Amino acid sequence: MSTVNPSVAKRSAARLAAVQVLYQMEMTGADTERALQDAKDRRAAEPKGRMADPDNSLLNQVVRGVSAQLEDIDGHVGRALSGDWTVERLEAVLRAIVRAGAWELSARPQTPARVCISEWVDVAHAFYSGPEPGLVNGVLDHLAQTLRGGEMGKGA
């Protein structure tokens, strides 16, 4: 039986929490710092051991990064969507996932692209049991090839 590295679990928890914060921001109009503080307060009120504590640095980076670069991120995501799909047409949680994944691919080269894609697909599986994780995979793979072509084995 294998065990999960605690730092990996913390980063995974941070990605999941980031989606929740981004969703809250979109649904309530809360600003970035308020939404991050609300998330911290909710975690403090939860029983310990229920979930891995998130890597707060990564959580803050993702939420602040997506917030600060939303227009650019939406442009990248929009170009990666197929057909007549638009970022606005995506359901809010799905939109938060692809935005966060797109930000990480563009802003955190220390995370290998394939790891980044896999992590965000795992986050999608936490919310969806249908085709949505496949959409996340397709969009992020397209973005990885565009943003990190050499790493993905294809030219940009």
Curated annotation (Swiss-Prot):
Q: Cross-referenced SUPFAM superfamilies, in alphabetical order?
A: NusB-like
Q: Which residues cross the membrane?
A: none
* InterPro entries per record: NusB-like_sf, NusB_fam, NusB_RsmB_TIM44
Question: Which Gene Ontology BP terms does the record give?
Answer: DNA-templated transcription termination; transcription antitermination
A GO cellular component annotation here is: cytosol
**Superkingdom of origin:** Bacteria
Per its UniProt record, what Gene3D superfamilies does this chain match? Answer: NusB-like
Q: Which NCBIfam families match?
A: nusB
- Which family is this sequence assigned to? Belongs to the NusB family.
- So what does this one do? Involved in transcription antitermination. Required for transcription of ribosomal RNA (rRNA) genes. Binds specifically to the boxA antiterminator sequence of the ribosomal RNA (rrn) operons.
**The protein's name:** Transcription antitermination protein NusB
